[in-house]
């Protein structure tokens, strides 16, 4: 869960207090009146922001259609325990930047050796021959200390990929584990390559999603 802004926290606290007092969430108009918004539409925008941050759920077609999903939105540390799941990675941004985190999963990092630092959603079938399938969650230990033959999470220019590493002089080859995919050749003299970590385990997609 991303942290709430002060205004979002006020809206969340109002919703929770109204449910505690009356058993029902407030309407958009009631939120606007209580917090001094100019219109119910302003309250709606704050509710949408809270829904995106996964602290409430909005029920379409109901004026009081608001469900609270967490007991205490301010308790960010508790909400964000577990391994972060990384989704799409924006160009030029660190892989663990907050905007890349889709969710947190209650997985013990120490069950992997070395221990996992994050999960990466796998896209495509390029590593299927070693059991890394489309939609799986790849457990990754964040390090740049890698050896030939290890399966790595690499960033080539601005594209993130999972491949087996081979270094040859000033060139790096990123090999797929699927004969339908050609190796990715990286000339370190002309291209940017960043190793984000090594694969330390796989969680089958259907187990968690």
From Swiss-Prot:
Q: Which residues form the active site?
A: 126, 163
Q: Name one GO cellular component term.
A: protein-DNA complex
List site positions: Cleavage.
Answer: 91-92
Q: Which UniProt keywords apply?
A: Autocatalytic cleavage, DNA damage, DNA repair, DNA replication, DNA-binding, Hydrolase, Repressor, SOS response, Transcription, Transcription regulation
Family annotation (SUPFAM superfamilies): LexA/Signal peptidase (SSF51306), Winged helix' DNA-binding domain (SSF46785)
Show the CDD domains listed in the entry: S24_LexA-like
* Superkingdom per UniProt: Bacteria
What's the EC number here? 3.4.21.88
Binding region for DNA: 28-48
Q: Which GO terms describe its biological process?
A: DNA repair; DNA replication; negative regulation of DNA-templated transcription; proteolysis; SOS response
The record ties this protein, via Pfam families, to: LexA_DNA_bind (PF01726), Peptidase_S24 (PF00717)
Q: Does the keyword Membrane apply?
A: no
EC main class here is: hydrolase
Name the HAMAP family on file: LexA (MF_00015)
Give the function comment from the record. Answer: Represses a number of genes involved in the response to DNA damage (SOS response), including recA and lexA. In the presence of single-stranded DNA, RecA interacts with LexA causing an autocatalytic cleavage which disrupts the DNA-binding part of LexA, leading to derepression of the SOS regulon and eventually DNA repair.
Q: Which family does it belong to?
A: Belongs to the peptidase S24 family.
Kindly provide the name given to this protein in its UniProt entry: LexA repressor
Origin species, per record, is Vibrio cholerae serotype O1 (strain ATCC 39315 / El Tor Inaba N16961)
Gene that specifies this protein = lexA
